[in-house]
Swiss-Prot record:
K(+) binds at D129. The active site is at D109 (proton acceptor). Its cofactor is NH4(+); K(+). Coiled coil: none annotated. Belongs to the type III pantothenate kinase family. Catalyzes the phosphorylation of pantothenate (Pan), the first step in CoA biosynthesis. Disulfide bonds: none annotated. Keywords: ATP-binding, Coenzyme A biosynthesis, Cytoplasm, Kinase, Metal-binding, Nucleotide-binding, Potassium, Transferase. This is Type III pantothenate kinase. GO terms for molecular function: ATP binding; metal ion binding; pantothenate kinase activity. It comes from Kosmotoga olearia (strain ATCC BAA-1733 / DSM 21960 / TBF 19.5.1). PANTHER family: TYPE III PANTOTHENATE KINASE.
Length: 261
């Protein structure tokens, strides 16, 4: 079994990958992973609750957008499991070409999403990941050709709250009418509805350039918030990032084995 981790700015999602499937997953606050020992305590509790023996973990695979935690995962792996984790990056030789200006700048989560989309849904896809930031990743003919980044709904709302004197934090959801009658709905319409239409416009423009038949795959914790009515997501795969991390890991280990002879 593999332990896979999608480390985000706000939350981290751990998963157990075995025989081509994510068997279990857990979402925790990234702030709980400040040292290798804290990571051990958290993971031991999660795995025990899921009836998974920590000693059954044979590999660790991590996609992190929080660079300072990369070393923590290495310390944890070596100290408690005698394993060196695989860190997801945009490298050559793993089945996807990186047709962008600076592949080294692609976030690990985006690499994992592209790998996962390519492995499970084919060589053409638009992937929408709705986390702290929202990413749009475009896969065409088996190559990552670019995308877009925009603020996620929580980030946008907290920017309003922190930069103004009177605007409150509110629960976020899509509002059916588009003329708010109170401050809370005004914020929801601006933040959630506004993001919905921004995504819809971006996807429409991408399809104009590449063709209408390219599927739109959604992942990330806020994806259901934007799949309103006849939504523009063709596929909702909450495990896409974890699956992509696991596939990346398997391909890297195969490359390492082949290079070792």
């Amino acid at each position: 079994m593999k332990l896979v981790a999608d480390v985000g700015n706000t939350n981290t999602v751990f998963g157990i990958w075995n025989r081509g499937k994510i068997l279990k997953n857990w979402r925790i606050s990234t702030g709980r992973l400040e040292t290798e020992d804290e990571m051990y305590v958290v993971l031991k509790q999660l795995l025990e609750a899921g009836n998974v023996d920590l000693k059954s973990i044979e590999d660790i695979c991590v996609a992190s957008v929080v660079p300072r935690l990369n070393s923590i995962f290495h310390y944890f792996g070596r100290k408690y499991l005698e394993l060196d984790p695989v860190l997801v990056t945009a490298i050559d030789g793993i089945g996807v070409k990186w047709d962008v200006d600076f592949p080294s700048e692609i976030g690990a989560d985006r690499v994992a999403n592209v790998i996962g989309a390519h492995e499970f849904y084919g060589k053409d896809a638009i992937v929408i990941d709705t986390g702290t930031a929202i990413t749009v990743d475009v896969l065409k003919d088996g190559a990552f050709i670019g995308g877009a980044i925009l603020p996620g709904p929580m980030m946008a709302m907290r920017a309003l709250f922190s930069k103004t004197a009177k605007l409150p934090e509110v629960d976020l959801f899509y509002v059916e009418n588009h003329i708010g009658k109170n401050t809370e709905d005004n914020i929801r319409i601006g933040v959630v509805n506004g993001t919905y239409y921004a995504l819809k416009a971006i996807i429409s423009k991408v399809k104009e350039e590449l063709g209408d038949k390219i599927p739109v795959i959604a992942t990330g914790g806020n994806s259901p918030m934007f799949n309103i009515g006849n939504g523009f997501f063709d596929i909702l795969d909450s495990d896409l990032t974890l699956k992509g991390i696991a596939v990346f890991c398997e391909r890297v280990r195969k490359l390492e084995k082949n290079s070792a002879g």
